């Protein structure tokens, strides 16, 4: 058994500072936060897209991508709830703009099926919070099978971000 002093030595506290910008936490003149978030969506999307676009070279910038493009022939997008709906839209755009085969899976189903993991597939996990339990379990399953994993999350300190081999933060601000 581990005594209390040993247990305390194993735990490391880490303080994360949130944005001090009150605009992120106040609803201002809006009746509801949801109305505020809907109104802010165009700027939020623009900021996210601009993070990854090189306007001068008219190209996409994804720095430090750990996989060789030639090693990837397909993409599987995995999420739950509204993140799953984001995967549906992403599938459409990937198919329009790339030659990749794209599949979508609901995380809660993915983890219970008998999956045929493919070494040439990039498994992309989508989660706003980065803490969705079913999505995390699906990521863990892929990691145990040594698959190529990537996450699209808003919280870069999240469990899903930490355990993915590559992270694409969306920088949408606090929930």
Predicted regions span which residues?
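Single conserved hydrophobic/aromatic residue that forms the stacking wall/gate
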Residues: 1-11
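Flexible, low-complexity linker/loop segments at domain and module junctions
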Residues: 14-18
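Glycine-rich phosphate-binding loops that contact phosphosugars or nucleotide phosphates
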Residues: 70-175
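Short coil-to-helix leader/linker segments, especially the first N-terminal amphipathic alpha-helix
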Residues: 48, 56, 100-102
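Helix-enriched interaction subdomains in cytosolic or periplasmic regions
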Residues: 19-54
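A short, well-structured juxtamembrane/interface segment
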Residues: 54-71
């Amino acid at each position: 058994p581990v005594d209390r002093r040993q247990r305390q030595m194993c735990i490391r506290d880490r303080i994360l500072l949130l944005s001090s910008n009150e605009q992120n936490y106040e609803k201002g003149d809006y009746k509801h936060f949801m109305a505020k978030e809907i109104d802010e969506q165009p700027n939020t999307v623009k900021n996210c897209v601009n993070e990854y676009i090189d306007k001068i070279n008219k190209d996409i910038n994804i720095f430090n991508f750990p996989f060789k493009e030639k090693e990837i022939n397909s993409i599987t997008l995995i999420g739950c709830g509204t993140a799953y709906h984001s995967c549906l839209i992403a599938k459409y755009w990937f198919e329009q703009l790339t030659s990749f085969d794209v599949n979508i899976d609901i995380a809660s189903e993915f983890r219970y099926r008998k999956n045929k993991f493919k070494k040439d597939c990039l498994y992309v996990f989508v989660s706003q919070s980065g803490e969705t339990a079913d999505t995390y379990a699906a990521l863990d399953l892929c990691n145990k099978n040594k698959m190529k994993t990537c996450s699209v999350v808003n919280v870069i300190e999240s469990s899903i971000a930490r355990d993915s081999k590559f992270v694409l933060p969306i920088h949408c601000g606090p929930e």
